[in-house]
Amino acid sequence: MYHVTKSKEKLWIIIAGLAIGVVASVLVLLGNPKNMGFCIACFIRDTAGALGLHSAGAVQYVRPEIIGIILGSFLLAVGKKEFSPRGGSSPMTRLVLGFFAMIGCLMFLGCPFRMILRIAGGDLNAIFGLVGFAAGIGCGVLYLKRGYSLKRTYRLPASEGSALPVIAAALLVILVAVPSLLKFTTATEENPSPGPGLFRAEIWISLLAGLVVGGLAQRTRLCMVGGIRDAILFREFKLLLGFAAICVSALVMNLILTAVTSGTYFTLGFESQPVAHMDGLWNALGMLLVGFACVLLGGCPLRQLVLAGEGNTDSALTVVGLLLGAAFAHNFKLASSGAGPTDNGKIAVIIGIIVVIVIGEFNIASNKRKG
């Protein structure tokens, strides 16, 4: 019976990964930036810009995909009676880790989800990110083995657990009904292609895609960090199957779309990749920070959105940390661009790695004192 259940879990994870890869490629076909059908970090950054939290005009748009992931997870959790409002597990630590995870993402120009999609689009620069990501997860696993553990969660009122889904729904209403309250990346005659924020699929298509991905990720517990972490810690590879399935299906879709449309959705190489730079060292270090921070958080940015939809206020606070990190990165020129990383960004990544190490050491020391 156990083996049957485990096989069904693996099958669901593979199906979810294949479906998510297809959805991501279709979003690019319908208007999203190349190799960015989904990117949790980039889309939170765009949303921060739309809310006026930063002034980088190239990246301002409330991304319905983020709203959809939160609401998709929320609706499925409620439907399956898995909605469980809880929180109080080292909230400020999670906020800080979320902040620095975003700094790492914007050094690399993508979250773990986009890293996979970049590889599927032929971007070999993302391989450096994958190496750094795995190394960062390895660092985090060492801390887990030494006794790192955040505090237990506590049950909370439903109003607390519903806060982020309600905010997401309110943002959707504003985007559809009162868009004048938001900022948008716009094209001009002088600059007809100002940045990624200009490229987007239709609102309802993006929302539907987010709902599908959010629901599938909630159903399968899909996590980009969890796959590598579990493989190292427990020799358990089922979450890695989802990781691989996304890459394979997105790759196949990109090759098909390149063959049957006038666009180019797969370009193998390092140069001229969309929304990417070629500095391998800083691609690796940025994702090392992401992997390290996310292991200590307990999941990748996608997983944090899904958990927040399920009622976890600690994950909701992590999402706030990601939002603040995105705003800070663009206000203080920490984010990379196609031209490469900035000096400020390099300093921020090094500081971030040090901060994550300090958090880990203090946590282990505190847990040892408590016995």
Each language-model region and where it sits:
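Membrane-interfacial helix-loop segments of redox and metal-homeostasis proteins
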Residues: M1-G371
